[in-house]
Amino acid sequence: AMKMSVRAQDISSSVIDMYLMLYYDETNNIKKFKLNEEKHKFNVPADTIFVLGGIEGEGTVNIEDLKSLFNLQDSVQEVKSHHIYNGVFADCLKSERLERFLDLLIENDWHIHFNSLNVLYWSIVDILDSIDGFVSQIPANIYMFKALFYRVMKSNLSSFFDLVLKYRYPNIDSQDITAFMKDLIFMCKLYNYSSGDAELGLIEWLEMGSRQKELVFVQDEEELVMLTELSLLYRSEISTWINSRLIMDNEIDIIYDFKKNPVSVDGKILNNYSFVDSKPDTMVQLSDVAVGIVSKYLYFIDQHGTESEKIISESLNE
């Protein structure tokens, strides 16, 4: 599945067969995304983006050299993203320390790698995946319709919230399928589309779904709980980079989950990864810096869309 995804992005699938040293940290691990009925709100902001990733590369650098490079106080025991940059993404780009961080990567031929999960996006795409024939399209069309559907739902979160509550999503009763899909279609028709958007195609798919007797991925699930198991992203990395060495920052929940249910491929338990304390491992510390800026970047473009480049340009010219 990962090789198909890689090919869809026009990247050679041989890349994931390589041996790489991959260091990881995470940001925005929300554990769970659900609707809190008593407080009448989601437990976390719906536009939260979970990022898992860090530095790819051989070699290392000692903490004293990093403190000197970033001009940090002697009392600093480990480098964290807040030492390097602060504020929204456009503000972070003005940071001299961020520039030094990027120079360090270039000088050592290190790269930033990451996997991300947009909480709202992953909570709603199961609706489209439940429509007969939807996933049989070419990958580009699948991604296009999912992205458009996400924009529609994100633009009217209060209506989406009401639908989750009304239909106990993602535990929709079979007799409510038509009404649920019709409500989604109504939301889609209200959205202010850009030219070139495939809104008619999206509505057509939802119409098809409204005629189904079941929506397999959004029924018989725990109601009002849209996302659990962020360990799946860890599992995906481990089973994708099967020939590589993965060094991950200690995450107690993930370690416990893996002990209960080891990561395996074709029945073979994988041992290409290890969890470490970030304090003595500067590459994991640098991974915290990497995922932090990636997270800010992804959030920035999610908020500003096509205006992102203009806003960044204006910010840098101030």
PLM regions: where:
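Phosphate-ester processing/binding pockets and catalytic centers
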Residues: 1-318
